């Protein structure tokens, strides 16, 4: 079973320099100038259920692991098993809220100000408040409500399957099924 582990340095790091999207920034550099402590300590860990990848073929499983993002005292992960984004307190590991998505969430949300934005296999992009997970807005990001059978359930013909990126006041994402 996947285990989400947060070290003490992540809590201190999050206060100084957040990790607001997958691989840190719009360039997907996965790098920061933040210094690591000499001796990190385990702060908390959580058992999370295994995700449900979009494809059974292992080499196609782009979504087989949790991808956390951090802002302030919130750590967020998307879940393709539970069709939601889950927020945890970075100090205690306590679950703070769940924002339901009406479809699998396969990629990390992007944190923009006091909100988190994410897409799901239902073809929608949703914005929720970081404080409580309540919906600020939801937009159908695709041209129609057409559905197909995917992972033993109905999903959009154009699921939102690209981790969103925020840059210069805009959010970018991708929709569609691949490989064809």
Residue ranges, per PLM feature:
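Generic low-complexity segments that are intrinsically disordered, proline-rich and/or Lys/Arg-biased
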Residues: 3, 38-41, 110, 165
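Aromatic (tryptophan-biased) beta-strands that constitute blades/sheets of beta-rich domains
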Residues: 17-66, 73-76, 84-86, 94-101, ...
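Residue-level detector of intrinsically disordered, flexible termini
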Residues: 11-16, 115
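Sec-dependent N-terminal signal peptides
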Residues: 3-13
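Repeat-blade elements of multi-bladed beta-propeller folds
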Residues: 19-23, 59-85, 102-126, 153-180
